């Protein structure tokens, strides 16, 4: 089964949009799962987006294509705030699709511009728009922005310059641009995920956990218009307004270090400059108008995207997420990346010669006159300056010794050890085993790694659904973390933050109730031994002495499984 539809033992895996997991899956060509194969798939996706921007540039225009390629290579790093990370950290790119979502959003529009420039089949953009809707559920709006820009460009600007001629087929194609992403979104996020949510609720799962999107939009707009709201929305109004103010602060002030050039206003200024140069460079009035419309509409959509984020922080996210603007950076740079990519697409087309054909009549003879207009060569220099500037700035922040290139093989020892241990453990398991993960002191990353390292053997979510009797709030507990009796919870630190306080009976019920057949003791500590030793037939003696990592779930308790444990 594919990663996208497999039951990975997590509550969300079956609902994740399958675009990126499928991409990762199809690059696992030979052998077992490996992290680097995911990166290969992502890199090919990135380069396909870059090709969409420079694909229309002919070979003789290498003075444009080469520096433009350098600019594109910088984009995924230039507009993110991870450029100061100096320590190796595991990144599972199947879970963070924000950069790919932004690239595909901009790449779809760039591909459309290249298709029109070369009079290629226009329908080829429809699968790209569909893909853009299948990367992340919360970036579906970016797919709609791309579809809207393509649709407006097609509908307003006829190929022959006659608006009325071919209006009906242009209208049909414009509607198809919206239909492609909306069909994918409806089939997956509405029909399929809706079915899973309803099934979860009927099976005593969490069901629907957030306010309906339509109601969020309506009540949020009412607040902006000064109209009164009631109930839940009145309670969250202050949170909504605070989130908007904080987002504005991040955009305008130096506190918002979201890119290599600082806060959001600097990014928008750079994108505006690229659009302005593209308009000036365009050799025909028609192309100038097309670029101006795309630039203006994408700017309006940027405001709408910010409104969507504010509504999410105000009415969908929990209060602490709104107070801290949790993950704001990766939500907003999806738009920045896509916006910059489509601006570069406009610039690439603007730097190409434009041919206009006018028809007339000389008596009974039809006469067509073709005019070829060349852009000014000086505008090509702008691309070179932009490339040099971005490469210089990136070189300042991402020094070779602070990148993957600067780390010795020994830095990857821990990751290799994790993979080796997973392979060893899996060799003692049956294909239908379900593993309960015990990793004391884990913040969730170890459990998350194990989910993929053990596949196709399932690693359980290792938790349960609980409902607060006072507030009625439903939440998942598990996915790694510190397990122990409620009274043994540490006062501070990682173990306190990720503490799951279960009695021995509760833990036993969770393990058996979730259908787990094996416990994987990745890391032990005194809290776990003191809390749950009586559940194990050997009081955890084998695990403490390093004789085993696995315990089989039996009627008599959790029994140690004999295995050869590496001493390394």
Name each model feature, range by range.
Residues 1-23, 32-33:
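Extracytoplasmic catalytic/substrate-binding loops of multi-pass membrane glycan-assembly enzymes
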Residues 423-480, 521-525:
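Short periplasmic/luminal acceptor-recognition loop of GT-C membrane glycosyltransferases, typified by
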Residues 40-65:
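Transmembrane-helix motifs of polytopic, lipid-linked glycan transferases
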Residues 142-178, 460-464:
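Perimembrane helix-loop-helix junctions
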Residues 26-29, 167-280:
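Membrane-lumen/periplasm interface segments of specific transmembrane helices
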Residues 122-137, 141-148:
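Membrane-interface alpha helices of multi-pass inner-membrane proteins
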Residues 94-105, 135, 141-142, 319-349:
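Hydrophobic/aromatic-rich transmembrane helices and adjacent perimembrane loops
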Residues 196, 200, 207, 381-448, ...:
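Membrane-embedded, lumen/periplasm-facing catalytic core of multi-pass transferases
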């Amino acid at each position: 089964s594919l990663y996208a539809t497999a039951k990975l033992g997590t509550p969300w895996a079956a609902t994740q949009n399958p675009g990126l997991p499928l991409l990762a899956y199809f690059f696992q060509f030979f052998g077992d799962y490996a992290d680097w194969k995911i990166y290969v798939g992502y890199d090919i996706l990135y380069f396909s987006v870059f090709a969409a921007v420079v694909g229309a540039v002919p070979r003789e225009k290498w003075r444009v294509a080469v520096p433009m390629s350098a600019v594109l290579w910088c984009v995924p790093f230039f507009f993110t705030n991870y450029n100061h990370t100096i320590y190796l950290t595991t990144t599972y790119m199947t879970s963070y699709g924000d950069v790919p979502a932004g690239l595909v959003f901009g790449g779809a529009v760039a591909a459309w511009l290249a298709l029109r420039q070369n009079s290629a089949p226009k329908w080829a953009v429809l699968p790209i728009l569909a893909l853009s809707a299948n990367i992340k559920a919360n970036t579906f709006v970016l797919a709609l922005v791309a579809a809207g820009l393509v649709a407006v460009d097609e509908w307003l600007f006829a190929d022959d310059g006659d608006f009325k001629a071919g209006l009906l087929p242009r209208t049909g194609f414009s509607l198809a641009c919206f239909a492609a992403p909306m069909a994918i979104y409806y089939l997956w996020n509405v029909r399929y995920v809706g079915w899973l949510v309803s099934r979860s609720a009927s099976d005593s799962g969490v069901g629907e956990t957030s306010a309906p999107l339509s109601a969020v939009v309506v009540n949020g707009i009412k607040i902006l218009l000064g109209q009164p709201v009631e109930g839940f929305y009145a309670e969250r109004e202050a949170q909504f307004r605070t989130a908007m103010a904080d987002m504005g602060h991040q955009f305008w002030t130096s506190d918002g270090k979201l890119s290599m050039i600082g806060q959001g206003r600097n990014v928008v200024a750079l994108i505006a400059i690229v659009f302005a140069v593209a308009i000036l460079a365009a050799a025909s009035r028609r192309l100038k108008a097309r670029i101006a419309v795309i630039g203006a509409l994408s700017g309006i959509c940027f405001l709408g995207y910010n409104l969507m984020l504010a509504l999410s922080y105000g009415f969908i996210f929990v209060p602490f997420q709104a107070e801290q603007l949790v993950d704001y950076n990766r939500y907003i740079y999806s738009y920045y990346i896509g916006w910059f990519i489509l601006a570069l697409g406009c610039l690439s087309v603007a730097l190409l010669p434009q041919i206009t054909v006018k028809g007339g009549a000389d008596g009974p003879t039809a006469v067509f006159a073709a005019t070829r207009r060349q852009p000014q060569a000086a505008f090509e220099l702008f691309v070179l300056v932009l490339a040099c500037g971005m490469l210089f700035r990136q070189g300042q922040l991402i020094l070779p010794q602070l990148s993957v290139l600067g780390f010795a093989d020994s830095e990857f020892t821990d990751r290799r050890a994790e993979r080796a241990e997973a392979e060893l453990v899996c060799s003692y398991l049956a294909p239908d085993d379900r593993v309960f993960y015990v990793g004391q002191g884990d913040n969730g990353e170890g459990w998350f790694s194990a989910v993929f390292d053990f596949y196709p053997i399932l690693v359980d979510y290792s938790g349960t659904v609980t409902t607060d009797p006072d507030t009625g709030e439903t939440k998942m507990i598990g996915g790694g973390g510190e397990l122990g009796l409620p009274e043994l919870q540490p006062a501070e630190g990682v173990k306190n933050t990720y503490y799951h306080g279960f009695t021995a009976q509760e833990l036993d019920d969770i393990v058996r109730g979730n259908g787990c057949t094996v416990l994987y003791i990745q890391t032990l500590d005194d809290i776990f031994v003191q809390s749950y030793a009586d559940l194990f037939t050997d009081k955890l003696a084998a695990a403490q002495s390093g004789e085993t990592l696995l315990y089989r779930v039996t009627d008599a308790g959790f029994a140690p499984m004999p295995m050869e444990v590496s001493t390394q």
